[in-house]
């Protein structure tokens, strides 16, 4: 309570309590003088004052308790300093050497395992594994970047093919007469003679043949009206010829004679 005595609300409560004391003393004096009506009004006012003061004190205690219960979200400066002090130092070459030497000393101090049955001795295989772990922890994995070839640059040629291929001297077979050592060279030269590079001819793709179907052509001749009349006359002329035949004439003459006789 000593911390909260300087709060302004507590000061007002103290003043209200003192005023209520004086008020009670005055009521007692009035009761002695038999003034009951005034005493009743004073008691009601005093009861109202006490109730309000109790409500105010309850609100103050609740607000103070909630403020204490809430944790601080942001860390203080002391906490940050403690965290910085507890962080381990980064791995340097000196630290790596010291740890490496300490591990070696511990491994050397351990005696090798001896089999009593076979009489063979063998060292601990943990040295290699521990050294590998330390190297993996100390040296980070180097990220290998693929070589970037600029545009238009040819890829590197394999020089192993040039080194592996042995160039034999060209020995003509005509000079190998009587030399037994020359004949295999001549044969090898013939086998390994560089053949002429084959010429690549690009064949053009044949165009697809399209077979066209023959179309029937109908020719229409225009005939003039004069030509039509000539064709009609040609058709009529043989009939006239038939009528003007000699047999027809004899028949006509006989009919005329018969007619004259009848008359």
Swiss-Prot record:
<keyword id="KW-1043">Host membrane</keyword>
<feature type="disulfide bond">
    <location>
        <begin position="176"/>
        <end position="182"/>
    </location>
</feature>
<dbReference type="GO" id="GO:0016020">
    <property type="term" value="C:membrane"/>
</dbReference>
<feature type="glycosylation site" description="N-linked (GlcNAc...) asparagine; by host">
    <location>
        <position position="251"/>
    </location>
</feature>
<keyword id="KW-1032">Host cell membrane</keyword>
<dbReference type="GO" id="GO:0055036">
    <property type="term" value="C:virion membrane"/>
</dbReference>
<feature type="region of interest" description="Binding to host heparan sulfate">
    <location>
        <begin position="187"/>
        <end position="198"/>
    </location>
</feature>
<protein>
    <recommendedName>
        <fullName>Major surface glycoprotein G</fullName>
    </recommendedName>
</protein>
<feature type="glycosylation site" description="O-linked (GalNAc...) threonine; by host">
    <location>
        <position position="139"/>
    </location>
</feature>
<feature type="region of interest" description="Disordered">
    <location>
        <begin position="244"/>
        <end position="263"/>
    </location>
</feature>
<keyword id="KW-0945">Host-virus interaction</keyword>
<keyword id="KW-0325">Glycoprotein</keyword>
<feature type="compositionally biased region" description="Polar residues">
    <location>
        <begin position="98"/>
        <end position="129"/>
    </location>
</feature>
<feature type="disulfide bond">
    <location>
        <begin position="173"/>
        <end position="186"/>
    </location>
</feature>
<feature type="glycosylation site" description="O-linked (GalNAc...) threonine; by host">
    <location>
        <position position="199"/>
    </location>
</feature>
<feature type="region of interest" description="Disordered">
    <location>
        <begin position="197"/>
        <end position="218"/>
    </location>
</feature>
<dbReference type="GO" id="GO:0020002">
    <property type="term" value="C:host cell plasma membrane"/>
</dbReference>
<keyword id="KW-1133">Transmembrane helix</keyword>
<keyword id="KW-1160">Virus entry into host cell</keyword>
<feature type="glycosylation site" description="O-linked (GalNAc...) threonine; by host">
    <location>
        <position position="215"/>
    </location>
</feature>
<feature type="compositionally biased region" description="Low complexity">
    <location>
        <begin position="72"/>
        <end position="86"/>
    </location>
</feature>
<dbReference type="GO" id="GO:0019062">
    <property type="term" value="P:virion attachment to host cell"/>
</dbReference>
<dbReference type="GO" id="GO:0046718">
    <property type="term" value="P:symbiont entry into host cell"/>
</dbReference>
<feature type="glycosylation site" description="O-linked (GalNAc...) threonine; by host">
    <location>
        <position position="92"/>
    </location>
</feature>
<keyword id="KW-1015">Disulfide bond</keyword>
<keyword id="KW-0964">Secreted</keyword>
<feature type="glycosylation site" description="N-linked (GlcNAc...) asparagine; by host">
    <location>
        <position position="163"/>
    </location>
</feature>
<feature type="glycosylation site" description="N-linked (GlcNAc...) asparagine; by host">
    <location>
        <position position="127"/>
    </location>
</feature>
<feature type="glycosylation site" description="O-linked (GalNAc...) serine; by host">
    <location>
        <position position="253"/>
    </location>
</feature>
<dbReference type="Pfam" id="PF00802">
    <property type="entry name" value="Glycoprotein_G"/>
</dbReference>
<keyword id="KW-0899">Viral immunoevasion</keyword>
<feature type="glycosylation site" description="O-linked (GalNAc...) threonine; by host">
    <location>
        <position position="80"/>
    </location>
</feature>
<feature type="glycosylation site" description="O-linked (GalNAc...) threonine; by host">
    <location>
        <position position="72"/>
    </location>
</feature>
<feature type="glycosylation site" description="O-linked (GalNAc...) threonine; by host">
    <location>
        <position position="231"/>
    </location>
</feature>
<keyword id="KW-0812">Transmembrane</keyword>
<feature type="compositionally biased region" description="Basic residues">
    <location>
        <begin position="204"/>
        <end position="215"/>
    </location>
</feature>
<feature type="transmembrane region" description="Helical">
    <location>
        <begin position="38"/>
        <end position="66"/>
    </location>
</feature>
<feature type="region of interest" description="Disordered">
    <location>
        <begin position="69"/>
        <end position="166"/>
    </location>
</feature>
<feature type="glycosylation site" description="O-linked (GalNAc...) serine; by host">
    <location>
        <position position="105"/>
    </location>
</feature>
<keyword id="KW-0946">Virion</keyword>
<feature type="glycosylation site" description="O-linked (GalNAc...) threonine; by host">
    <location>
        <position position="87"/>
    </location>
</feature>
<keyword id="KW-1161">Viral attachment to host cell</keyword>
